[in-house]
Amino acid sequence: MGRKKREFNRLRLDSGQHRRIMLVSALLGALAFLPVGLRLYSLMVTNYDYYSSLALRNQTRTTTVTADRGDIFDRNMNILATSVSVENVYLDPHELKQSRADIPEIARTLGEILGKDPTWIEEQAADIRRRYKQVGTRIDEETAGKIRDYINEKGISGIHLEPTSQRVYPYETLAAQVVGFTNASNEGCEGVEAAYNSFLAGSTGRVITTKGNNEMDMPFSYENYVSSRQGDSVILTLDATVQACLEKQLSAAIARYDVQNGAFGLVMNCKTGEILAMATLGSYDPNNYLEIADEGTAAQLEEMKRVYLAEPEGSEAYEAGKTAYGEALSAARLKQWRNRVISDGYEPGSTFKVLTMSAALDCGAIDLNTPFHCSGSEQIPGRAQRLHCWRSTGHGAEKTPQALQNSCNIAFAHIALKLGGERFYEYVKNFGVLEKTGIDLAGESKGVFFDKALVTDTDKWGTASLTSGSFGQTFKITPLQLVRAISSVVNGGQLMEPYIVSEILDADGNTVMKAEPTVVRGTISQETSDTMRTLIESVVTEGTAKNAKVAGFSIGGKTGTSEKIDVFDENGQRVQDKIVSFVGIAPMDDPEYIILAALDTPSRTTGIYISGGVMAAPTVGAVMADVLPYLGVKQSFSEDDLAGKQIVMEDLTGMTAKDAQALLKKEGLTAAISGSGETVTGQIPSPGQTVPGGSQVLLFLGQTPEPETVKVPDFYGMNRQQASDAAGALGLYILVTGNDEISTGVTVTAQNVAKDTEVPAGTTITLVFADTAARD
């Protein structure tokens, strides 16, 4: 009995011990498995996204499919910016190593095809820390074909061609600041490319494929394609022909007047706000946007670079020179990319008088018979300094029309006093001078105008700001602000919102967005607008802007000459540099187009009087002579205008002399007869040549004229009679443009055919006449 009890107790002990052992084992097992469990939890739950992504990257390859960027067109569907297909070449060093490729041989071959240093390519291929090493950028189809053939011939794994696109600007420098450019990442920078990047860019696609343990693609195992979306195309209001005409005449003016700091200009529809042309010169080529286009600036930068590179690398002089060079290069690039028409404020000078007079007439502060007197200078109440008119001898007695025609500062100071600071400020505000225009381009500024108190609280601040402001001095606005404001003066009093993009189309040609003219607010009454149109036209017919005349067109406008009062030389002295400008409008019976041309810092070495009337007015006149016929504005010639009318000669041979003379008379031409007989056998000018109205045509009867060439004389500085005599002596004709007054002070300032050029007898030479006497 006792033995059985002991046996039972032993078994019970063994059972309890066993349970304890099992429990301890379970606990130890749990403790041992805990890190593994936590690790599994981390892998499968906490960091699931990370490891899933890592596995996906190891098992798949993603290739980017670049979206085609949309095109940019002018209003006539001429392509201003487009994209062409190119390819990038990249190496996968890891893949090259896995495939045991002959790296030196690959480097030599690619170096030869791409024109790159083989040693550099070999270094890229050896960098196994990276899976993507680009060795060729935007190569053409022919070069890509050579690389593709090499890959296939050698069976190489690790060299890849990546399709992409390259932006191309067919018109090169034309409207460069408006169109803008794209950077190396194909993102829009500057101009329309930047402002409408979200439309133009489209969306990038991708192809995802699996890859095996040898890093080769396995497209039949798995492939996922996310298509790209082609960018939308943008149609501008810009007209490439009008833009080219504007830039041509601005370039000619820069050369003619030795302009030191470039020029800017604008052509706008004053009824709608559409921009037909917008130019900043000097310009740049967006195909090579990092290259400095101005030769003088480029030479200075090269010299800076040469100087610092001559210093020991790492020395203080080297580092300082390198920094200075980098800053100068960056500043030069930003300057050539800058659209001055919307981004830079300038003192508008006397062009602003149009707004001051409009305001004064509109509110009744003056009328057309308000008298003024200019003696050349006057001590205006509330001004510390004596006010001077641009004409030192004064204009004498004048009324409101003459005040504008003469661009008289003294008269406008008194107009401002009659208008008063409160009304002056409110009208200026209404004209949009204190706000951005809202144009659909990036980088617009709004200029800098007076604080309201400076012009309204004359008891405290005097009248200097009010009176100087009346003729466009001591404040700054942008060229576009000025043009928009003056447009409202002549279009019936409607301030328009200017715009550069007329329509956006998707890849299928569907309209995504279409712009419409937008009236911001009214500025003056229709009656005041009608009056101002008459006054503005009289500035060209009788005032300081006679040099802007174009035969057959009714043109109005206002000249401006402003000092750059915030520019100082290296000694801290204020320079005497000027910006000369002219705003022209046509046709004045129903204004449609407004054109601004401004020349920044004409040289004093040319001997030509620096003023808007002498320099900018004929520049705008030349633009109008080019673009108004193209834009469909009808010409109407009076007897006085005939010398500026171009008549295309018909073929008169075979006609009777009587019939030929009758036809010429109908065209406003006369005839001289050479030879005898009844039938015309030859003529000078030849058929198809142009001849000015009122000219004499030489008809040959019974004989044929021998072809004759003559050298074009230098007409520069000749008056109308002298030029006519010189041309007639050589059998040439002259087409008169610009100032058509017959006086000794009106002389030739430009000719369309260079002196000593050989041309056929009977050729018409276009001469620009201008009065170079002192004019505002």
Where do the protein language model's features map onto the residues?
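Extracytoplasmic/secreted cell-surface and envelope-processing proteins
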Residues: 131, 143, 275, 287, ...
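Extracytoplasmic
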Residues: 65-68, 75, 83-86, 130, ...
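Periplasmic/cell-envelope proteins involved in peptidoglycan metabolism and beta-lactam response
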Residues: 1-319, 336, 345, 422-429, ...
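Short, solvent-exposed alpha-helical surface patches in non-cytosolic proteins
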Residues: 175-177, 274, 354-355, 483-486, ...
